[in-house]
Amino acid sequence: MSLTLDSKIYVAGHHGLAGSAIWRSLQHRGYRNLIGKRSREVDLRDAQAVEAFFASERPEYVFLAAAKVGGIKANNDLPGEFLLNNLTIQNHVIDAARRHGVRKLLFLGSSCIYPRLAPQPLKEEYLLSGPLEPTNQWYAIAKIAGIKLCQAYRRQYGCDFISAMPTNLYGPGDNYDPLGSHVLPAMIRRFHEAKVSGVPSVTCWGTGSPLREFLHSDDLGDALVFLMENYSDEEFINVGSNQELSIRELAEQVSRIIGYPGTIHWDSSQPDGTPRKLMDSSRLHALGWSPKVG
């Protein structure tokens, strides 16, 4: 039985950047039987809470977008939390989905799964071909484990569990917490606050040389619903825009758009992160999907 507009669909993490975009895309397409729970309602780190939720709600389809996320500093400062919390969340949800007969699950990973110095653009087959970027290896290891668990359950139990790896995201519902946000929302907040307070200079980490690709969250939501409707394979699939710019260019654009009149200082004593990260999304595009926002 295939996905229908009345199918019972659970979006884990539906208030996050990715999860809320999935929710909007589902609603836009006419899906009307959606389930979303805040962490205070169902703590996905609690095995009994997850079991009770699946037993009572009986979702037919699951988007697993719930995760503990953050930037370089958060990953460096809280490696144990990033590794354990993400492993725990995805293990509980994926296994409960198997045991309760979920028809299809989509696990949402991250582009940080790829080796630090992998060839560019990043193709799916480059997974586990070299050492990870040290600044986010804990999150990456958890996401790799999630991919492999979906593959293992497909092989052993015949579960239709798929995985998608998005590039860097931006959009409504992003996290602007200075301790836990990613590069773009962190910059937006920093330059906005500097403008409001009249600070003459803004300091950014690193050299500004790393290259990054960005995708609007609504494009991601559209892509993930497209995959849930059209893709069924063991191999995970990249989701990107195929456009990149340097962190320095990003900072200059944010500064200009916000109207910040001061200067930008680059603190090269702080880490840059991965030198370049551009996804090869040709497999997804060959299926008939392409970004609308970019």
Predicted stretch roles:
Residues 47-87, 96-99:
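NAD(P)H-binding glycine-rich loop region in Rossmannoid oxidoreductase-like domains
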Residues 91-136:
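Conserved Rossmann-fold NAD(P)-dependent oxidoreductase catalytic core, especially the SDR/UDP-sugar
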Residues 113-115, 138, 162-186, 210-211:
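Flexible, glycine-rich beta-alpha linker
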Residues 104, 109-110, 147-172, 185-188, ...:
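Conserved beta-loop-beta element that borders a ligand/cofactor-binding pocket
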Residues 12, 37, 62-68, 105-111, ...:
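SDR active-site strand-loop-helix element
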Residues 27-52:
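Adenosine-cofactor binding site in Rossmann-like domains, unifying the SAM/SAH pocket
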Residues 12-13, 17, 21-29, 193-294:
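C-terminal substrate-binding subdomain of Rossmann-fold SDR/epimerase-dehydratase oxidoreductases
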Residues 138, 142-145:
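Active-site helix of classical SDR
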